[in-house]
Amino acid sequence: MIFDRRRYGKDNYTYLLAAGGDAALVDPGDPDAALALAAAHGVRPRWILHTHGHADHTGGTAAVARALGAQVLGHGGDAARYRPDVDLAGRAEVALGALALRVHPVPGHTPGSVLLEWEGRLLTGDTLFWAGCGNCRHGGDPARLAESFLGPIARLDGGLEVHPGHDYAAPNLAFALALEPDGAAARARLAEVEAAHAAGLEPAPSTLAGERAVNPFLRLDAPGVAAAVARAEPSAAAAGPARRFVALRALRDRA
């Protein structure tokens, strides 16, 4: 079994999954990076999966699909941005040879955003970041993102490893600590991330349980987070969690 990632651009990740002679690439935004990742492991992926349709995640898809003869899978909710060969809408699971993945629709960052679960790992695209969540400035809807966080994401097992589409961990953790200055878990995670960056390494993945200890968007009821939302938008303080989530996302947009 192979699970690996490669950074491209400033902070994007593409991922490789392989088992039993079958392999897939996830979010090959840069064709050279994606093909090099597959070549480094001596595999020829037959499938390309997308967490969502933004160009920094799909920009290399056509070239990689041509080079490998690979089939492209993605959620039809983002069909205005790209056209997958196989629509994941309505599919809770997908079997790709020896690879069996669970598909969790999480609209918000884009209409067709999904989380891909494989062997205890959760590929979260731009929906759930380490210590943060994706913005909704490019075709998204913060109210729908709130529903995804409060519904399907809240129900997922805490032991799942979180593998996002970008490494925004340091600025996200700085924002989290601005809301909760005494957050020991966030401070420890930031030190870990900064040490990895200083050594030229990639940060270790977190888990959903770890995210629930540091990520403000999973901590709406924490006193520091609730107080920050109340200061920024007093009318949201007494509202339900979805309204507080939207207010927190707006606060993060201004940070």
UniProtKB/Swiss-Prot annotation:
<dbReference type="GO" id="GO:0019243">
    <property type="term" value="P:methylglyoxal catabolic process to D-lactate via S-lactoyl-glutathione"/>
</dbReference>
<keyword id="KW-0378">Hydrolase</keyword>
<comment type="similarity">
    <text>Belongs to the metallo-beta-lactamase superfamily. Glyoxalase II family.</text>
</comment>
<protein>
    <recommendedName>
        <fullName>Hydroxyacylglutathione hydrolase</fullName>
        <ecNumber>3.1.2.6</ecNumber>
    </recommendedName>
</protein>
<dbReference type="GO" id="GO:0008800">
    <property type="term" value="F:beta-lactamase activity"/>
</dbReference>
<feature type="binding site">
    <location>
        <position position="109"/>
    </location>
    <ligand>
        <name>Zn(2+) 1</name>
    </ligand>
</feature>
<dbReference type="InterPro" id="IPR001018">
    <property type="entry name" value="Beta-lactamase_class-B_CS"/>
</dbReference>
<feature type="binding site">
    <location>
        <position position="56"/>
    </location>
    <ligand>
        <name>Zn(2+) 2</name>
    </ligand>
</feature>
<comment type="subunit">
    <text>Monomer.</text>
</comment>
<dbReference type="GO" id="GO:0008270">
    <property type="term" value="F:zinc ion binding"/>
</dbReference>
<feature type="binding site">
    <location>
        <position position="126"/>
    </location>
    <ligand>
        <name>Zn(2+) 2</name>
    </ligand>
</feature>
<dbReference type="InterPro" id="IPR017782">
    <property type="entry name" value="Hydroxyacylglutathione_Hdrlase"/>
</dbReference>
<feature type="binding site">
    <location>
        <position position="54"/>
    </location>
    <ligand>
        <name>Zn(2+) 1</name>
    </ligand>
</feature>
<dbReference type="InterPro" id="IPR050110">
    <property type="entry name" value="Glyoxalase_II_hydrolase"/>
</dbReference>
<dbReference type="Pfam" id="PF00753">
    <property type="entry name" value="Lactamase_B"/>
</dbReference>
<feature type="binding site">
    <location>
        <position position="52"/>
    </location>
    <ligand>
        <name>Zn(2+) 1</name>
    </ligand>
</feature>
<dbReference type="GO" id="GO:0004416">
    <property type="term" value="F:hydroxyacylglutathione hydrolase activity"/>
</dbReference>
<feature type="binding site">
    <location>
        <position position="57"/>
    </location>
    <ligand>
        <name>Zn(2+) 2</name>
    </ligand>
</feature>
<keyword id="KW-0862">Zinc</keyword>
<dbReference type="GO" id="GO:0017001">
    <property type="term" value="P:antibiotic catabolic process"/>
</dbReference>
<keyword id="KW-0479">Metal-binding</keyword>
<comment type="function">
    <text>Thiolesterase that catalyzes the hydrolysis of S-D-lactoyl-glutathione to form glutathione and D-lactic acid.</text>
</comment>
<feature type="binding site">
    <location>
        <position position="126"/>
    </location>
    <ligand>
        <name>Zn(2+) 1</name>
    </ligand>
</feature>
<dbReference type="Pfam" id="PF16123">
    <property type="entry name" value="HAGH_C"/>
</dbReference>
<feature type="binding site">
    <location>
        <position position="166"/>
    </location>
    <ligand>
        <name>Zn(2+) 2</name>
    </ligand>
</feature>
<dbReference type="InterPro" id="IPR032282">
    <property type="entry name" value="HAGH_C"/>
</dbReference>
<dbReference type="InterPro" id="IPR001279">
    <property type="entry name" value="Metallo-B-lactamas"/>
</dbReference>
<dbReference type="InterPro" id="IPR036866">
    <property type="entry name" value="RibonucZ/Hydroxyglut_hydro"/>
</dbReference>
<comment type="pathway">
    <text>Secondary metabolite metabolism; methylglyoxal degradation; (R)-lactate from methylglyoxal: step 2/2.</text>
</comment>
